[in-house]
UniProtKB/Swiss-Prot annotation:
SUPFAM superfamilies named among the record's database cross-references: Snake toxin-like
Primary location class: secreted
The protein's name in its UniProt record: Hemextin A
One annotated GO molecular function: toxin activity
InterPro entries: Cytotoxin_Cobra (IPR003572), Snake_toxin-like_sf (IPR045860), Toxin_cobra-type (IPR054131)
Organism: Hemachatus haemachatus (Rinkhals)
N-terminal signal peptide: none
Amino acid sequence: LKCKNKLVPFLSKTCPEGKNLCYKMTLKKVTPKIKRG
């Protein structure tokens, strides 16, 4: 799956593979972490 890191720039900082992960799939995993942090 091709992901657009431009939509979620914070992914690059939170997830090492943010560039390869899909923003839809990553948002679900990263969002809860960002709310706590």
